[in-house]
């Protein structure tokens, strides 16, 4: 198949396969919404209180998938929270789990002073006022196998991140305003391809190690 004259984006999934898209994030997707604490994304551990210690916070997980799931682009997590002070941080880790074995497929992090997004710092009345943190994951392209689950864990910070400069206790609220949104890809009809293989002697020597 000749693809040299096609204008588009080459994308590699977390399973290693390559395909072509006209743009990224992709335009031909279907958005699905899972409510935190619902049957689709139920509580699986932890508590709804996030302390600034990187070790506390809620965990949510889907039931085992009934079919393979393909999604990509920029998943969103919109979550209602209350804080003790004007500040706080949420780190969201998204994982593909097969029983007790999980692999990292994406993450998001937000300084709650910017919970509406953008560069304008917001303010609110701590404890009494609920805010909705509109988080966006770093770009993902994931294939999740049938029978696996998706797990999302919330904490104050994650691996390779520093503690928040404005630490605060954060209380997560479940319900209709707290949702994980992902964009489903239909793999049928996509242009798949194998990238050129390296035949240099250095590559061949490395493969033989």
PLM regions: where:
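Short phosphate-coordinating micro-motif centered on Lys-Gly-acidic
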Residues: 6-16
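Short clusters of hydrophobic/aromatic residues that line enzyme substrate/ligand-binding pockets
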Residues: 18, 24, 172
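Low-complexity, intrinsically disordered regions enriched in charged/polar residues
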Residues: 5, 28, 104-106
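Short, small-residue-biased leader/transition segments that mark boundaries at the very start
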Residues: 1-3
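Intrinsically disordered, low-complexity regions enriched in Ser/Pro/Gly/Gln/His and often acidic
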Residues: 11, 26-28, 199
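Short alpha-helical segments and helix-capping/turn motifs at coil-helix boundaries
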Residues: 17-21, 135-138
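Intrinsically disordered, low-complexity Ser/Thr/Gly-rich stretches
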Residues: 35-209
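Extracytoplasmic low-complexity segments
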Residues: 21, 25-29, 34
